[in-house]
Every structure is written in C-alpha cells, then in structure tokens.
C-alpha cells in the first residue's frame, strides 16, 4: 500500500446494468418478443424486419460492453472504491453480393464511443509507473467517439484470396484473440497491448490493406500494410480521414493453421507472426550521442525502425458428453519486442476456458488465465541511473523513479449466459507487482463484465 494524500469517493453506480440483467432474467416469463431470451437481439426482430434485412444483406448492430471493478485489497492506494467504464458500438455489415451483385464482396462500418474511468489508474498502479495491464480492458485510447471500421473486403478464386482495404486496426486480422476476460492481459491482440505506440488495437482505425491467401486446407498466410500515424490516437481525431501526421508504415505478416482435431473435429487455431515498423522510434536507454540518456539528460537516440514477433495458440481438447459445442479449450500467447525501443520486451500468457460446464447451464463458460509481462532491463537500468544522478534512494520521494521489472496478472471468471443477447461475467483478478514495481502491494480486484446486443 502506498496511499495518496487525497482519495476520492466511490465511482458511479452500476445498478442500472444489474437491473438490465434482472430484466433479461425475468423476461423468460413474458411473451414480449423484444426481450425474448431466445432472441439474438434485446429489442427483438422488429416484427420480422431484422430477419428480412439480413436476408437482403443488411446486418445492423448496436452492441454494449460495460466493466465494473473494485479494489478488495492491496495496490498502490488501498482506499476502497469502484470504477465503471463502457463502450457502445454501432455499425452495419453489408453483403454487397446480395445488395449490388458484387461477387463475394462485403462492407463494414462501425463507430464506437467510450466512457468512464479505470481502477488501474486510480488505485492499482503507482502513478509514476502505472499498471502495465488494466483491470478494465474496455477503457483506453481516449474516452471519445471514433470511426473504428470502414472497410471493403472481396474474395477471389473461390474464396482462396481475400483482400480487405479501408480503415481498421491491426488486431482485427493479425495476432487476433477473443476478449471474454476483463483484464487486458487476456483480451484481444497482445502485440497492440505492449507495443501500442505503433500497433493500434480497437477502437482506433487507420488506413490499411490486408491480403490473405488460403494456400492449403486449414492453412493461411496473410500480409498487411498499415498507416503509422500517431495523430490517429488523439481524442479529437476520432474521425480523421487525412494522412497528415503519417510517420511510416507497419508491415505485419502471419501464418495461420486452423486444424480440426480427432473424430469430433475439435477446432483449433495457431498463429505465428512478425511485424516491422518503418517509423522512427526512440531508444529506451541511449541518447543521441550513444551515451546513457539518464546520465546526460539529452534527447533519446532515434532508431530507424521497430519490430517484434508473436505466437498465439487456441485448441479445444475435449467435448462434453459428445457435444462439441461444450468442453475444455486451452490457450497461450507469446509476444517478443524490440529491446532497443520497447518498454515491454516480452510477454507470456496461459489459460483455459470450459464452455457448458453444467447440463443446466449449457451456454455458460468458465475461464482462468495467468500472464507475465516483463519490462525491458534497459528501462530499469535507466530508472536506476536517474535516481543515482538525482541522489534519491527513497521510494516515497515524489521525484524517485520506481524500478520496473515483471508484472503478473491472473483472472478467474464465470460467464452467465443470461439470454442470447446478454452475457454477464463476474470475475476475480489478482495482480502481482503492479507496474512491475516491487514496493507496490499485490492487488485483489473484483470485477463484472457485461456484454449485450440491442
């Protein structure tokens, strides 16, 4: 525990969303189509209109994700409180073969809006170092409106070649991973989480081209080119379309294997990839003259590029009494980053998910994940040098730079499939050495993640 001099009262209540869950639970007793538990949408089929639109090629969606978190013990500031953050996503997917007769062509448009505050910033991490992960993954990239997807995709040669162009993020296609957990270390593209200055995950978009080729059964290779433009991250540039501010390009390549295992054809997915950024990047230790920047105070040395690689593995390994829609799946992630320029130089993650654990709850799921995030040794070396130059060795001194090493995150959740349009996932998270700082107490956090489709 390292308390700030001033603490704030508990954050905004989340009772309205618990009421939403209660509405979903109680709706089964009513015949109202708008809240039918078996409907794909909370607001129903609009008298059959939505199904009619789907058949014509129009798929309109309004989705919501809300995440609450409360610190139960530990962290930098153990004054108990809660934080809530959320996201709305409004979009349309169009089958242009049905609409315009353009063979094997699709269009996607999505705007997002994020709100709220993050417990990691307010309680878990030392403000001088931060929490490397986040206990609320949906927070971040500016609490604002953004154009998140605006792309056209077309397939050729009976679907073997897939080309997508427009505005979208790298994690939509490369280093992709589900986002059922609430902790950031188990959600989405992990490259973007630890190399976020160049790899922009949802909800940020940039001009991009992705080409994917199915060269053998279950095997794919894809390459991409993404605009490297830091101005896209700015809160006021959520709908920026121009290329002003572009610094270079991010070039990822990835090999994908999607096997079906055993007599029950249990699905798996394995990804091996590499990225290269042509944009300049600051060295984490050296200055412009090749001397320790923490000693000289000069500008950091500018490197001409940045790179890294990743591995993602997901595999269902059992079914449940012969039902392949239920059963145990294993997952793992590994990312390795440029030691000259990246604060995090490597990350590992392991976990399990069991779908349909109980016959009475066949659509529920249970997940457990553990992650390790390692801070570049040169970052720690510079922090120690800065403290020596300043003559500071007292952690409580505001000018002290905390020494960062390794942060560990773990999460256990139970996903309640309330209806076909509402899932609620209460969870417990444990963070060891928040920010990789040994002086910060390990933190225990309770959370709840709500996902719904209107």
From Swiss-Prot:
One of its GO terms (biological process) is carbohydrate transport. The keyword Methyltransferase does not apply. It is found in: Cell outer membrane. Its main location: membrane. Keywords: Cell outer membrane, Ion transport, Membrane, Porin, Signal, Sugar transport, Transmembrane, Transmembrane beta strand, Transport. The keyword Disulfide bond does not apply. GO terms for cellular component: cell outer membrane; pore complex. GO terms for molecular function: porin activity. It is a multi-pass membrane protein. Substrate-selective channel for a variety of different sugars. Could potentially facilitate the diffusion of diverse compounds, dependent on the presence of a hydroxyl group, but is presumably restricted to carbohydrates. Involved in the transport of glucose, mannitol, fructose and glycerol (sugars able to support the growth of P.aeruginosa). Facilitates glucose diffusion across the outer membrane. Belongs to the OprB family. This is Porin B. The lineage of its organism: Bacteria, Pseudomonadati, Pseudomonadota, Gammaproteobacteria, Pseudomonadales.
